[in-house]
Amino acid sequence: MTNPIHIVGGGLAGSEAAWQVAQGGRTVVLHEMRPVRATDAHHTDGLAELVCSNSFRSDDANGNAVGLLHQEMRSLDSLIMRTADAHQVPAGGALAVDREGFSRAVTAALEDHPNITILREEVAGLPPEDWGSTILATGPLTSPALAEAVGTLTGRESLAFFDAIAPIVHRDSIDMGKAWFQSRYDKAGPGGTGADYLNCPMDREQYEAFVAALIAGEKTAFKEWEASTPYFDGCLPIEVMAERGPETLRHGPMKPVGLTNPHNPTVKAYAIVQLRQDNALGTLFNMVGFQTKLRHAEQVRVFRTIPGLENAEFARLGGLHRNTYLDSPRLLDATLRLKARPQLRFAGQITGCEGYVESAAVGLMAGRYALAEAEGQTLAPLPPTTALGALIGHITGGHVEATEEAERNAPRSFQPMNVNFGLFPPLAQMPRNETGKRLRGPEKAALKKRALTDRARADLAAWMTGERLPHAAE
């Protein structure tokens, strides 16, 4: 008799991983601590409970990265997507679900599966080694005992208990007629060139108006279970810094020293907003020190007053909330195994993905990796041109190593991320219209997204059939 694959955590990632393994013919033991031990966020003991929104976001597979991820997961027999489709409620172009019906259906599917045993018990420490292959999908509200055990194994600094998220901007939406590349004092850090940061200058009037807008902007209240979590020094929301005094920001993350504006070299900026490359492709830049609790609409409004960001498109908006996640690029291998103990895989939000769909997607791949390993097989690497491949690539190696300057302004270089087109390799050629003319504006953006999604579909189909990737040379 073969050993079962153990999965700890019955959320979206754990449920999807269990389904993938069981559908592949292997037995699964799924450990879920609810209702034996409750969390501050969950309200039921159902599997795959949606604790916040009931939305899986856009279902547009041609123009939206998460919609493409929906499509890819459906093609790989995703239980989460199948159940979401069956319990869909009207939500325009988004896929939203009846959350209670959704959770009940996922629970029933797993309870009824002949290859799955569900144990309602807390795994209070690291799983015993005689369990063999195990997937930890314990989410951002991992129980304290298990978080402590993982921290001990990996190094306590490898777990973050308060998640500071700064906005991330698409590089091609920044106005380079106002912004410029330069590191402070032209310092070339490890792997740098001395021109590693994008800089957006402000005069005094612009700065004072910006500070006033930050303070006046509508904030998102902490959830009840977050309110008692203290700030860490590197995680202060930018609006909290602004409230400490009108000059605080220009002596902190917006200090103008060591930088010269080549567009206006004789005038010294009063304050400067810096953006740091966020992914290895150089398509995404994060706003240094701009973690915030401003509501999303307020972030867009206020941050677009920054010179150079008037037309900024955001891959992710900022936030600050209690979370638990691994420094995955340092700790996990390409198949989501813990380097320090390869019997353990991680899946879901604890790996550093953001969002319901992304969590389930990582669970899907963790399940498939574990299944292949149990069968003595090796899955071919996911094409990075696919939504799944781009997401797994970000988690296991798509970050930028932190420089000394970056470490002073952020808790780490790797931070949670939703799937977005900034994680995808650029197209070999930008799309043109029927006459061969280069496009601009909304038409260009729409055709670019369609080209990215068409490429992804072709490459995933080739990966699924083992054929040579048609876009492998790009």
From Swiss-Prot:
Its cofactor is FAD. The keyword Transferase applies. InterPro entries: FAD/NAD-bd_sf, MnmG-rel, MnmG-rel_CS, MnmG_N, TrmFO. It is found in: Cytoplasm. It comes from the Bacteria. FAD binds at G9, G10, G11, L12, A13, G14. Belongs to the MnmG family. TrmFO subfamily. This is Methylenetetrahydrofolate--tRNA-(uracil-5-)-methyltransferase TrmFO. The lineage of its organism: Bacteria, Pseudomonadati, Pseudomonadota, Alphaproteobacteria, Hyphomicrobiales.
